[in-house]
Amino acid sequence: MDAQEEAEITILEISYLGGFVKYDLHTKGGNVDVVRSYYKYENGNMKREVIGNYQAEYWNYTEEGYLMFSGVWFSVELYVLTLSGAEEHTALRVQPLDETYRELSRKYLNPISFERNNMFIVDWSEEDFGDLNFYDMYDILYPKVNGQYAPYVADDNLSVSAVYQIPKEEFESVIMKYFNIDSETLQSKTIYDSENLTYEYKPRGFEEVEYPEYPYSEVVGFTENNDGTITLTANVVFPYAGDSKVYAHEVVVRPLENGRVQYVSNRIIPSEDNYRETWHTPRLTLEEWEELYGGE
């Protein structure tokens, strides 16, 4: 592309929905044109569902082995519904990643990921949990423990913040299944009512929503430690930003019986190239909440 020569390539990306995406890329004069087609297997035949095209506004092959490109694509079906195009941010791994690394990512990192939590954003450990937000962790871990979403939802009236009192045993049974933390420490990191033995819980409100584009962590190395824990080294890949290494971090996990796991620590690896976590919106502080809702 840098030489502005003419070339073309076709790339197939398997979809988790049961079909695949076909990218026909053509470059000439320094520009890259993309034709994007989605195919679905139906009634014994492969059927093309959607086709769209765009000129890539961003294009890069990264040191981490990713082909990343983005642009605004148009299709007849989409235009009928929205009268506009849709942004697409594509990250295709070209260099193969060891299957062991992929499995470690699927097993330990993907279940937490980056949506509405700061577990892989801040430094913390079992000795000092730092700024790890246990209310966000409760939201994420509750379905894994109980098989359904937590019943503590936001108020229908956006001007009112719902406040719940969760029984001590209920709150701790979720958190302590994935963290080696005692009651006293957990209470110091939350709002705890010692008289009623409950944890105060406020679901995320309108001011705490996030733009629904998130990165993912990809294991690129690991060490099995003598104490039975595993140290995972991972890169944060953010297709929306066209960045295959927003930053690198180390996550220590403790595998337990029956496929269970405890999360031991997270550490951001310092680098001048680290990029800030633009996707994350933290929960309101107590002062911010009081200012917005007047303590109601």
Label each region the model flagged.
Residues 1-296:
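Mature, Sec-exported extracytoplasmic domains of Gram-positive
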